[in-house]
Structures are given as C-alpha cells and as structure tokens.
C-alpha cells in the first residue's frame, strides 16, 4: 500500500477490475430474493456531463451500492434519451448526420459516467434512437391505436412562414418569433396525431393517493395539471336556434350571466358572426392566433374581445344576452364557450367594465363585506370595484334565493345542479384541465409513426411483422420546408398492406417524450428481441423502488410514464398500477455568479473565468464592481464547473463526497472550491489512518484473514478498557446513524458527517493496537463504500479483506455498545457553567449531589459557602444557588 493517496491511479484500476469481474451485473431474481430497482432519469446525450448530472447519478449510485451491501438483488441501469431537436440542429449547422453526432456523444458521456465510478449494469444499456428500441416504441403506438387511444385530427401548430416549418413551443420566443429565422410565428391548422390521455384522467388523479413516497409538491403539481373541475354542462340557445354548450363550476350563478364569450377558434364563430361584425371578428381571430395559450390566459393581461353581433337566451331567466369572442377563453378546455358572470368572476368583471356590459349581483355577501358604494349599487352592480367571489347567500336567483353559497351538501352549487337536471336544462359534469397529448412532430430525428395512408382504406397501421419502420439515412436536413421525411418520395411511397394499392407513409415522427415514457420497463428485459419484455420479468422488477431526477420533470415525463403504465396494464402486459414507488427530486447545483447591475440582458453576466480577483470582483471591460450571487450553473452565466476538471484534480471520490456532503439531496447545492478541498483532505486522512494501521501490523499479508475476524461478536466486552468502550460506542453510533440516514430520507450529508466523527474518534482514541481500533478501521471502510467506492475498495484490499468491499454485508450495530457506563454531569453556580465531571451511569440524584459537592469545580467556586438551594437534574446537571 502506498503512503500517499493517488485517486487517479486507484480509480482507473478498480473501474477496470469491476468491469472485468462483472461487479455491477444484475443478478437473476430467485424465489425469496429481495429486489431493489434504483433508477436515475436517463440523459439526453449532449456530449458532456454537467454537475447536475453528477449530482443526480451519484445520489442514485449511493442508494444502489448500499442496497447491494444489504443483500438486495439490485437493478441499476443506464440508457440514453437519444432522439430530439439538438441532433437535428447539429446536422444542419455542422453537416453531421444526427445518428453519427448522437452516437459520438453517447460514447463520450458513457466514458465520463464510468470515470465517476457509477455502478451501472452496462449490459442493459438502451438507446432510444436504436432500431432495436424504437421497434418497440412503434409497437406500443400500434397497441394504443388498437385500443382507440391514438387518433388523428386537425390542431393548431406554430408555423414559421420563412423557414416553412413547424416549430415546437420551446422554439418560439416571448415575442412570438422563431428562434432561427426571427419571423413572427403563425398559428396554422394541421392534421396531428394524439394520444387520448384524457381517458385516464380520473385514474391518474385518484392514484396520486398511492404515491406516498413522492414529494407532496410533485403530487400537487400533477393534481393541478390534471385539473379536475366538478360542475354542470348547460345548453344556451342562440336567437338563430343554435345550441351553445357551456361548462361551469358555478351553475348557481347562472341568473347573473349577462353575456357569453366564445373562444376565437370555436366552430360556431363563423355562423354567429353578423355581416356588420365580420371584419372586426376576422381581425381579432388573426391577433389571437399569434398569441400563445400561456399569454392568452395570463391573469394580469388586459382583456380584449369583439362582439359577434348575435345574442343567446339565458335558459334560467330567458334574458337576451350578447355573444362575444375573447382570447382568454381557450378552445381546449371545457366547451370553448363560457357564460360570463361579471359580478362574481374577476376576469368577466374586467371584461364587462372595459366594454360596458351589464353586471348583475346574485350573491349577497355577509354583512360588512362590501363597501357602502357597492351596497348602494344594489342589483345592477355597475359600480362594483371588484367581483365578489366569497361566501354569502343567493339573491335574484329564483329557486335558489336564500340558499348559502358553497359546494357542500345542501348548498348552492349542489342545489343548482339538481334544479337544472329536474328542469332538463343541464346536467352534472366533471371536466379536466388535462388535454389529449399531441405527439406529432414534423421532424426527422424521431421515432417514425408506423402508419400508412391509403386512398382506399384510409389509415392503415403498419403490420407488426414489418416493424421497425426505419428512418432513412439519405436525408438532407435544412431546417426548412416542413417535415424532412415528406421530401423523400422513395421512402414515402409504399404499398397498402391491406389492399396493395399505392399509398404513402406517415411523415410525422413521435414526440420524444414517448420514448422516455416506457424505457424503465424495457430495462427489466433489455435484450429481448422477441417481445417488448417478458411479463414475469417486468412484474418481478417493477415498480421502480427509487426514481431520482429533477423537479422540471414533475409533470410531463412523470405523468406520461404513469399513463403508459396504466395503458399497458389494461392491455395485459403488466400487473401494477404505478411505475415509481418513491421519487426524489434533487435540487439544482449553483455556482458563484458575477453580474454587473449597471448592464442589462446577457451582457450583465460576467463569466467567472474573466474575474481576476474573486474576493474583489470587477468588470473586466469597465472596471465597475460586480455583485456576487449563487445561481443555477449555465453556459449563459459563465458560472459552471466542468466535472472533467474536478475529476482530473481531485478524483471521482472527492467529487462524490462533496456533492453528497454539501447539502441535503432535495435542496439546492452551492458549489464551493474550499469545501471540495475539505473532502479531499478527509479522504487523505482516512487513507493515512488505514496506512498507519496496516504498516503497524506488518503489512497487508499479516492482516489477511484477521481483519475479517474482528467483528463485534468477537470482542470481549467485559474486558474492555474505558477508552475501548468509548471508541466502540463511537463505532456503533456511526453504524446506526449512517444506516438510518441511508434508509429513511437519504440525508447523505449527515451520514458523511458521522463518518468524519468516526475518523476523529479513531484518531483521538490512543489505542491503535486494540482489537476495537481494528473493528473501527474496518467499519469506517465499509461505511464509506457507497459514498467513495474506489478508495474504500483500495483500503479494503490493503486490510486483507476477502473479495470486493462492495460484496460485503452492511454492518449492523450492537445496541449494547451504545449504552454508556458513565454520564457527564454539568456543574453550575448561580446558573453559570463552572465545570463538569463523570459519574456512573446508574448514579442516584443524592449521589450526584454529593459527587458534585466534592468536585474540584465546586470546591473552587463555592469557596466554603453553604448553598441556599441545590437543583439536581438527574444524570445531567447540578446547580448550586448561593
């Protein structure tokens, strides 16, 4: 064993050895096996790891390594979410085929992951852009199609009029311009493919109750995204006789509806618009088409709209009310039309005030809730300062007058629904904010949709025997002209599998979220080329026991994965309801960030590399002093830390220890070079402790076989000295605390703090030749193994340990060792600390007082005086009051 810790030398050595012996290979599950499936959200192969990756994967790796040492059969795989726009853009910008660019990046990132010492089963590696994977993605599409869950319809898309192509929402900036051409983006209607996720809305919502191992924040985000609303569907009739359906959560306020508002995209707009209003309506529709749904539905945005020229009849009171269109009403939610009750809805109130529409109050607030002006305005509440949305009683509402406002039994909403159903004017309905999933992408680098369009047979699914539908390689990518696949006539033209006529392939590719919505299932049987996975294997390994990833995936990826799992359950492919039992959303990694408050935009951020004096930072261009904050690492801020540099200088174990020690996993982590250095010093200290122990014992060979015998059960507790008992207590306290930190809330930071305490206790014990010291050294190395796997392996071998440290059993603590023989008693005089002394653990209060009186501290500070009062806190404190 070398006297000096050299992480680069030992880490590469052990990584090669682990690969050679298949240390991380997933074992076959046997009857009675305890399984544990640990999974990090797999990355997009951008080419370089960032510190966010390092944190995510290190967290999961510690969990996986700990579970293996506990005797679990562990599945801990890795793969690549490899389709997507960046590869296509790289092909356009650099003239590199997307596949070549992607696989180069995968090779580079795989090497980086291996250098971190991550215990992945690389034999199960999957790549979503590989035909042997996307064959099964296409097969899943066919299962959705057969189940009626995949369909095609016209839908609005972002259209770049310069590049003549469809843009994803992320490619449209805040001003509504294309990221590439700068052109104002238009909304166009194109035929698009959808997955009917709304068919599972009720299950997705109800089963959130099963996810007790998920953060409450994530469950709430999903609940809000699904957005269940209980209310009523009510039919209004226009004066022309057309039916206009609305969904409302407040049917009790129908008597206060003074106008209606339709979405600009509502199919009845054309029919209801009069000739006099046609030009104004057309202009307004064009304006609305240029705005995103987020912009349109912003609460603080000024309301806009235009009258159609038509009227509807309020079914509950036969009043004639005007029909408007406004972009704050979205076609995708409810029916695309609303009844407007301005006295009791703030958006409707602002709209009515702007356009001079009537405001009628139908809820009487509790006494004292309204201003005198509002009370005086009475029924025609044109002078209200804001909509009243609180409690009260119904007024001006016919059969509901006097009923208390609320959604509970016997309250206004329930009574209104019952009355509407009895009158045949409406019915109870449950609506969801969730919309069907638009999966079409007019892109090349994605999974082809396995559908053929036949002029005679219509939409024909590709036969399963013909899967996969391969992406053509001879494609020219320009970023212009719509779908690149549509330009390849030789690929597009195909015979209809049903009738044999000339037909055309679908040229859209699938949303990449589809590839990531089932990858965790494939890992259970990753090399199966006959079926997507064997049912017995997926049921044995799934659900995932611990899933780790960023909060940014709280909604879409996690919701889609839950949806896929439920569909595949209903198709008989698996037998569980939810894919992930426990979820950990790690915090961001933040870097020291410099900015000039006198500059704006991107120019205000000054890259850390340009700051010469971090203690007194100045702008290298202007000399102005810079402000310093911690912000999420990003290229734009120039505040990132390259993992490669950290590995080269300190090694993987130091990087892992810092990442785990600096902050609890769910909190943001502030990168600090001084703390990295601190972890490096700690590992050096442990190295020296083991080195000195081995040298003192005559070298590794003299210890071979002996270290494994120095187990707690072998220690003769009765013959131990006080120093040995104290050290043994520290050893078993460390085992207990580290085990609990790894088992419960993954408080890795406090677990590492316990390792430091144990190292300190070993250094201070002064009994290097004791068997208890040997037990402590052995325990320290075992406890370190999940956190710093390379140094733990090297030290374990130096101690003469058999096999790999990662194949050892996790140590268990001896409860008897935690019980102290003595207790420390604090001495106070008039409430001030004056000293302490050791007393037997079984000391009585009377004995404690007498021992305190005879102590050196009491003799010094009492100066012979007799205390007026003595306060004894058993086994803790004696306070002498003079």
Swiss-Prot record:
Entry-linked PROSITE patterns: AA_TRNA_LIGASE_I (PS00178)
Keywords noted in UniProt: Aminoacyl-tRNA synthetase, ATP-binding, Cytoplasm, Ligase, Nucleotide-binding, Protein biosynthesis
NCBIfam families named in the record: leuS_bact
GO cellular component: cytosol
Protein name: Leucine--tRNA ligase
Top-level EC class: ligase
Organism: Synechococcus sp. (strain JA-2-3B'a(2-13)) (Cyanobacteria bacterium Yellowstone B-Prime)
Record's catalysed reaction(s): tRNA(Leu) + L-leucine + ATP = L-leucyl-tRNA(Leu) + AMP + diphosphate
Pfam families per UniProt: Anticodon_1, tRNA-synt_1, tRNA-synt_1_2, tRNA-synt_1g
Family: Belongs to the class-I aminoacyl-tRNA synthetase family.
Record localization: Cytoplasm
Motif 'KMSKS' region: where in chain: 632-636
Main location: cytoplasm
Any one GO molecular-function label of the UniProt entry: aminoacyl-tRNA deacylase activity
GO terms classed as biological process: leucyl-tRNA aminoacylation
């Amino acid at each position: 064993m070398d006297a000096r810790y050299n992480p680069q030398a030992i880490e590469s050595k052990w990584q090669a050895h682990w690969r050679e012996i298949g240390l991380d290979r997933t074992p076959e599950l046997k009857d009675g096996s305890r399984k544990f499936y640990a999974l990090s959200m797999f990355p997009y192969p951008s080419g370089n790891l960032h510190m966010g990756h390092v944190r995510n994967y290190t967290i999961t790796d510690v969990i996986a390594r700990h579970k293996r040492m506990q005797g679990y059969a562990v599945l801990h795989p890795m793969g690549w979410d490899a389709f997507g726009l960046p590869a296509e853009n790289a092909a356009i910008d650099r003239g590199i085929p997307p596949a070549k660019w992607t696989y180069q990046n995968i090779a580079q990132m795989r090497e980086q992951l291996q250098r971190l010492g991550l215990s992945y089963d690389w034999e199960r590696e999957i790549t979503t852009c590989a035909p042997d994977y996307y064959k099964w993605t296409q097969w899943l599409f066919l299962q959705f199609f057969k189940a009626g869950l995949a369909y095609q319809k016209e839908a609005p898309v972002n259209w770049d009029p310069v590049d003549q192509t469809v843009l994803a929402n992320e490619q449209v900036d805040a001003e509504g311009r294309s990221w590439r051409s700068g052109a104002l983006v238009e909304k166009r209607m194109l035929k698009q493919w959808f997955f009917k996720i709304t068919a599972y809305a009720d299950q997705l919502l109800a089963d959130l109750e099963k996810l007790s191992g998920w953060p409450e924040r994530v469950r709430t985000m999903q609940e809000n995204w699904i957005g269940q609303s209980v209310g009523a569907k009510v039919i209004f009739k226009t004066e022309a006789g057309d039916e206009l359906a609305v969904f409302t959560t407040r049917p009790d306020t129908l008597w206060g509806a003074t106008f209606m508002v339709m979405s600009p995209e509502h199919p009845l707009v054309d029919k209801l618009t009069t000739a006099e209003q046609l030009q104004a309506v057309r202009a307004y529709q064009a304006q609305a088409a240029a705005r995103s749904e987020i912009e349109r539905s912003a609460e603080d945005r000024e309301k806009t709209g235009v009258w159609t020229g038509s009227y509807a009849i309020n079914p509950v009171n036969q009043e004639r009310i005007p029909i408007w269109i406004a972009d704050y009403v979205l076609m995708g939610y409810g029916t695309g039309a609303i009844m407007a009750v301005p006295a009791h809805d703030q958006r409707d109130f602002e709209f009515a005030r702007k356009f001079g529409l009537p405001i009628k109050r139908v809820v009487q607030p509790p006494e004292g809730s309204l201003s005198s002006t509002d009370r005086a305005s009475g029924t025609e509440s044109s002078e209200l300062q804001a909509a009243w949305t609180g409690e009260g009683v119904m007024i001006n509402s016919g059969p509901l007058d006097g009923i208390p406002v609320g959604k509970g039994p016997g309250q206004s909403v329930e009574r209104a629904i019952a009355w509407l159903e009895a009158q045949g004017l409406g019915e109870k309905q449950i609506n969801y904010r969730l919309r069907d999933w638009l999966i079409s992408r007019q892109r090349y680098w994605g999974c082809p949709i396995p559908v053929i369009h036949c002029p005679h047979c219509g939409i024909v699914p590709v036969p399963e025997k013909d899967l996969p539908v391969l992406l053509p390689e001879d494609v020219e990518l320009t970023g212009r002209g719509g779908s690149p696949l549509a330009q390849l006539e030789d690929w597009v033209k195909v015979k209809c599998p049903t009738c044999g006529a000339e037909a055309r392939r679908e040229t859209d590719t699938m949303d990449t979220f589809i590839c990531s919505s089932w990858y965790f299932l494939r890992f259970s049987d990753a090399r199966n080329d006959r079926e997507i996975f064997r049912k017995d294997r997926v049921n044995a390994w799934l659900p995932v026991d611990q899933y780790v990833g960023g909060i940014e995936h709280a909604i879409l990826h996690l919701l889609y994965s839950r949806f896929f799992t439920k569909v595949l359950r209903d198709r008989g492919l698996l037998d569980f309801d939810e894919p992930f039992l426990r979820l950990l959303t790690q915090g961001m990694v933040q870097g020291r960030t410099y900015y000039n408050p006198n500059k704006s935009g991107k120019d205000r951020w000054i890259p850390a590399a340009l700051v010469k004096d971090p203690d007194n930072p100045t702008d290298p261009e202007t000399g102005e002093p810079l402000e310093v904050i911690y912000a999420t690492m990003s290229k734009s801020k120039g505040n990132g830390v390259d993992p490669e540099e950290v590995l080269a200088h300190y090694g993987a174990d130091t990087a892992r220890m810092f990442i785990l020690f600096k902050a609890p996993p769910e909190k943001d982590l502030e990168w600090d070079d001084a703390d990295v250095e601190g972890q490096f010093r700690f590992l050096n200290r442990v190295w020296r402790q083991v080195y000195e122990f081995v040298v003192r014992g005559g070298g590794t060979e003299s210890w071979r076989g002996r270290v494994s015998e120095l187990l707690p059960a072998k220690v003769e507790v009765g013959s131990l000295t006080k120093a040995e008992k104290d050290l043994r207590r520290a050893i078993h306290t460390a085992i207990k605390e580290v085990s609990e930190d790894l088992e419960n809330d993954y408080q890795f930071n406090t677990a590492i703090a316990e390792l430091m305490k144990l190292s300190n206790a070993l250094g201070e014990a002064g009994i290097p030749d004791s068997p208890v010291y040997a037990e402590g050294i052995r325990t320290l190395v075992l406890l370190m193994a999940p956190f710093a796997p390379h140094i733990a392996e090297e030290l374990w071998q130096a101690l003469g340990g058999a096999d790999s440290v990662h194949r050892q059993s996790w140590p268990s603590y001896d409860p008897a060792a935690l019980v102290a023989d003595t207790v420390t008693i604090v001495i106070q005089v008039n409430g001030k600390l004056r000293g302490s002394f050791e007393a037997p653990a079984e000391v009585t209060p009377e004995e404690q007082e007498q021992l305190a009186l005879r102590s050196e501290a009491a003799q010094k500070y009492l100066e012979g005086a007799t205390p007026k009062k003595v306060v004894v806190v058993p086994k803790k404190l004696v306070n002498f009051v003079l």
